[in-house]
C-alpha cells in the first residue's frame, strides 16, 4: 500500500481546519459540605472574592470566604438540591445586575430577575453591584432641593439631591410612609417638568412581608408613580444572601441615572434587616463576631453602600443619587450598634417617635432630635424666607411647653409663644398620600409665621389650611406661579400673598 505523506498531511490539515471549538475549559470544584445556605467548596483555586459560581440545576452562589483549603460560598436560592460531591463551576463574573430605563415600572429580585409576571426585561446594560463610591474630585456639594412634599421635612429638615438622610424610628411610626410620599411627590415633575429635574425612584424592600411590598407597588401604580420607579424586593422568605445583596443591586440601578446626568432617589427599607442577614451569613461562614454578634465589618457594609449616594460635578454630568436609608429601632434606642453606625455615616436623620404618632402628630417627626447636615443650602430662597422663623419659634415652644406644665400664671409673651407653637405644630401635620408642591408649602407656612392662625382655635387649623390651598389654587394661582418661577418671595409677591391671605381670612368661618 502506497502512503503519500503529502496526502496525509493535507487530510490532517483539513481535519484540523474544520475542528469544532465545542470544547470549553471551565474551572470546577466539589462541594465538601452544604447547609444553612452555605456551601464549602474544594478545588476553586483561582476564584475571585465576590465571584458568581454555579451549582448543578442552575442555582447560583457567591464566593465570600477564600481560605487556604476551601471556599465559603453563599447560595442565592434553596440549598435543598445541592449535595456533597456536586461539581461547582466558576462563571468568571463578579455579581452584576441589569441597569437602565428598561427596569422602570418593574419589580425585580436582588439579582435583577423580574418577579412581577410582566415578562422579561430587555436591559442591554449590566453593572456590578459592588463598585467603589465616587471620590472627592468628581463630587459637588449638595445645593438643589429634593422635595418630599411633606411640610415638616421640606421646611425644617430639608433634603438635597445627593444627600443621605436617615429615616429612623420604632416599628409602625410611618417610616415607609415618608418614602412613599417622597416618591409620589415626584409625579408632578415627571408629568410636566423639565427633563433635567426629573427624579427617578428606586425602592429596596429588605426582609419585608410580601403583602407589604405588594401594597407599596399597588399604591404607586394607582397614583401613576410606578412608571418612574424600580422596586427591588428581597422579602422575609428569601435567603439571607439575597437580603444582603438587594441594597447593593438597587444602588447599582440608581447609579445608572446618577452617572448619566440624571437624578435618582433610593430608599433602603430597611438596613437593620440587611445587617441581620449579613450577621447570619458571617456567623455561618465562621467569621469572628463583635458587638451584638455583628461581624467587625458591618460598619463598612453600610458605609460603602451609602457613600455611593452623591452629587456629581458638572464635568461628570451633574447627576445625583439621593439615599433615604431606613433603620428600625427598639424602644426608641438610637444608641444601639446599627443605629449609631448609620447615624454617623449619613448627613442627618429624620427621627420618628411613637408617642407623637399616637398623639395624632403625623408625620411623627421629632423636630428637636431630627437634623439635616446640609441644611438651608438644600432649600429654595422662598422656603428659607419662611422656614427660618418657624424653626426658632418651634424650638422656643418646645422649651416653654415643658415649663408651662408647672406654672399656671404665664406672662402674655409666653402665652403668645405657646399659642403660636401649638398652631404651628398643628400646621405641620399632613395626611398620607397628599404631598404638597413647594410653592403651596411656602404659602401655608407664610400664613403660620405671620400670625394668621393665632386667632383660630387649634382644631380649625387643618380646615383653614385646606380652604387656603383651594382658594390659592383657584384665585391666587398667579401668586403660586410667581413663587415657583422666582424661587423667592419678592416684595411684590409678598404684598399679593398678604392681600390674598387677608381676603381669605375674612371669609373663613
Curated annotation (Swiss-Prot):
GO terms for molecular function: ADP binding; ATP binding; proton-transporting ATP synthase activity, rotational mechanism. Signal peptide: none annotated. Its EC number is 7.1.2.2. CDD domains: ATP-synt_F1_alpha_C (cd18113), ATP-synt_F1_alpha_N (cd18116), F1-ATPase_alpha_CD (cd01132). The record marks 370 as: Required for activity. GO terms for cellular component: plasma membrane; proton-transporting ATP synthase complex. ATP binds at residues 169-176. It comes from the Bacteria. The keyword Magnesium does not apply. The keyword Transmembrane helix does not apply. It is a peripheral membrane protein. It is an enzyme of class 7 (translocase). It catalyses: ATP + H2O + 4 H(+)(in) = ADP + phosphate + 5 H(+)(out). It is found in: Cell inner membrane. InterPro entries: ATP_synth_asu-like_sf, ATP_synth_asu_C, ATP_synth_asu_C_sf, ATP_synth_F1_a_nt-bd_dom, ATP_synth_F1_asu, ATPase_a/bsu_AS, ATPase_F1/V1/A1_a/bsu_N, ATPase_F1/V1/A1_a/bsu_N_sf. Keywords: ATP synthesis, ATP-binding, Cell inner membrane, Cell membrane, CF(1), Hydrogen ion transport, Ion transport, Membrane, Nucleotide-binding, Translocase, Transport. F-type ATPases have 2 components, CF(1) - the catalytic core - and CF(0) - the membrane proton channel. CF(1) has five subunits: alpha(3), beta(3), gamma(1), delta(1), epsilon(1). CF(0) has three main subunits: a(1), b(2) and c(9-12). The alpha and beta chains form an alternating ring which encloses part of the gamma chain. CF(1) is attached to CF(0) by a central stalk formed by the gamma and epsilon chains, while a peripheral stalk is formed by the delta and b chains. Belongs to the ATPase alpha/beta chains family. Produces ATP from ADP in the presence of a proton gradient across the membrane. The alpha chain is a regulatory subunit. This is ATP synthase subunit alpha.
